[in-house]
Amino acid sequence: LDSKTKNELIFASITVSGTSISTISNSEGNFSIKIPTEKQNSSLIITFLGYNNKVVAIKELKPEKNVLYLEPSNTMLEEVVVNVRDAKNIFLGVLSSRLQNYGNEPIQMTGFYRETIRKRRTYVSLSESIVNIQKQPFSTVKQEQIDLFKGRKNADYIKLDTVNFKLQGGPFSALFLDLIKYPNFIFSEHAFDLYDFSLEDITQNNDNQVLVLAFKQKPTNENPLYYGKMYIDVNSLAVISATFHLNVADKAMAGLQFTRKKPVGVDVYPTEVRYQVNYRQENGQWIFAYSRGDLTFKLNWDKKIFNTIYSTSFEMAVTDWKKQDTKEIQNTQKLTSNIIISDKVSSLADPDFWGEYNIIEPEKSIESAIRKIQRKTLNERSID
């Protein structure tokens, strides 16, 4: 929580000191983290953009219901302006500094992935999985490999009505939000022909000053592009976080980017598309840590008075990592970039399913949906 306003700090990074074990707070500011017995003398390090880092000894924490407060950082604008030439040069500096900021070696990561689909306010699909990722450096065109370690799901196809609404890409959708590895997701080599850049604000990340670089598509470009903000460390010019939205003003054009196939007589278009990606500093370099997408679609039927609203969210947090060995994933659980994860994993039932693995603590609405699913599954088993 913010120490002054007591507001929740969402998507804050939580790391066990001296290790690569980590998680992230959810959209309600809550988190849980599983700590090995041999690390009980370590500390938790909580970081959040615009705040001083919080370090707390694990032994001082209760098993649950701890409340932690972070202090807002003080920004000294005058010291930064002297060193900033213009927004265009800042972005060029980001691109030219990628090697020193993000390294050139592959990394073996463990990640937790969750995706949900709601029909209006009701959850109709929930999928979660632990994945092993062979994360490739930005300097190679080689795509990441993802191995499904374990996962669970539930989908209520009755509530899905006549549309079998599914999210394609699974964990790859989250990885493709890595703007350092995949800059063409937003920025091509002609970025300055497509976007206007501006220096919007200056904040802090612990003791380091951070530039807030805003971007939006040029008004002369009619194709749906993105608008948003990048948060850039002023000393290294590393992107430490970014939030961005798709311009959905042209419904038909925006809809073409997402709809693979649809029934005859229905128009599908997005009403909101929002993405976020965070990076974490480890041993002087920044690595991919978390990403999230929130998308809302409207379905208009030719012969129906009312439309249908579907909302889908996906997120992935890196919970552990190490230097990668040279072996590629060779088993049958290797995922492809067009995977539909809800078709790949088993039913949601066991409340202790994740064991020792760290996950993103579910929001209250998701937690309630999980409990309902587990009760329903247990009732069905008892009837059988």
Predicted ranges, named:
Residues 1-9:
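Structural motif
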Residues 20-30:
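Short, acidic Ser/Thr/Gly-rich low-complexity loop/linker segments typical of extracellular
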Residues 31-33, 64-66:
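Short strand-edge motifs at loop-to-beta-strand transitions and within beta-strands
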Residues 33-41:
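Short Pro-Gly-centered beta-turn/loop motif in secreted/extracellular proteins
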Residues 45-56:
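A short, solvent-exposed loop/turn motif at the edges and junctions
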Residues 66-196, 206-209, 259, 264-384:
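Surface-exposed, low-complexity/disordered segments
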Residues 183-234, 238-245:
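Extended beta-strand-rich segments in extracellular/periplasmic secretory proteins, especially
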